[in-house]
Amino acid sequence: MSFSDNLAKILDKYENLGKKLSSGIMGDEFVKASKEYAELEDVVAKIKEYNKAKSELEEANNFKLEVGLDNATLEMIEDEIHTLENSLPKLERAVKIALLPKDDADSKSAIIEVRAGSGGEEAALFAAVLFNMYQRYAELKGWRFEILAISDTGIGGYKEASASIKGKDVFSKLKFESGVHRVQRVPETESQGRIHTSAATVAVLPEAEEVDIKIEDKDLRIDTYRASGAGGQHVNTTDSAVRITHIPTGITVALQDEKSQHKNKAKALKILRARIYEEERRKKEQERADSRRGQVGSGDRSERIRTYNFPQGRVSDHRINLTLYKIDEVVKNGQLDEFVEALIADDEAKKLSEI
């Protein structure tokens, strides 16, 4: 089937769904048709814009062939033809992007987990910097940032930290942040002024609802214990800390941030559900597209994706060869959009090349 035939088929389907919805159908049939109709709205709008430009180009070319046109009119028509010819490839690309298979998780909120990697205390300090950077970014985007757990070192660093970020299409924007982030800077404790390299790992998971992942009580092992502070001392006289293990997958989440065992359990279940959902997504993605494993967005957490070089004031994303010399704006102010948009565009381009 040609590209044009495929577009015509989509327009026919959209029109038929509209007629069906107007015919008075009810119940599950109405719900199903409404969902399909809504899912097609965006691509149909882009198809109509593309078809309109094609039609206008054809009309302009035909008009240009008419006898007796003065020079001013001919120049005006040629300008219009030039504009339309330039716009058509962009409109066609927009249609193709709209036709790409959607990741069901893209529209979801996200859970972000940051863990200190190699580099000791400096790595923990960098993990805290990254976590705060994502909090600033969430604020800029108008998303709700809820801290789930922080395991601190007592001097400003984070061994690990997690948060729930709620908003529209959060996961689609943040999913490319998963991986190893490397920092190069002179630690405050370094008397010789030598640059140290350390790293932190970021994992971004789509926040799963109960409808996405059903967790049976029989599949959970829940252990409670007393919360401990940064030095290992017990900071609570009750067993408020919770460790939940999902027996079928072996995935474990431990939480002790809240004084209430009930609150710790609720937060731990939220993280557990997200991890199980992400594991299932990974398996399906691997089965569906093994050939795309090496692409941006493969989510390989062992992959070094970005370097933050403070002496040079630069942030470099190694997947797309993009370097920005504004480290303070990125790290302190959370201005990540240039990286986010470039990564999304790169991912779309690679997917389009497979069509």
From Swiss-Prot:
Gene Ontology MF: a single term: translation release factor activity, codon specific
ATP-binding listed as a keyword: no
Cellular compartments annotated: Cytoplasm
Biological role: Peptide chain release factor 1 directs the termination of translation in response to the peptide chain termination codons UAG and UAA.
Pfam family, one: PCRF
InterPro entries: PCRF (IPR005139), Pep_chain_release_fac_I (IPR000352), Pep_chain_release_fac_I_sf (IPR045853), Prokaryotic/Mito_RF (IPR050057), RF-1 (IPR004373)
Name this protein carries in UniProt: Peptide chain release factor 1
Post-translational modification comment from the UniProt entry: Methylated by PrmC. Methylation increases the termination efficiency of RF1.
Entry keywords, A to Z: Cytoplasm, Methylation, Protein biosynthesis
UniProt biased composition (Basic and acidic residues): 280-293
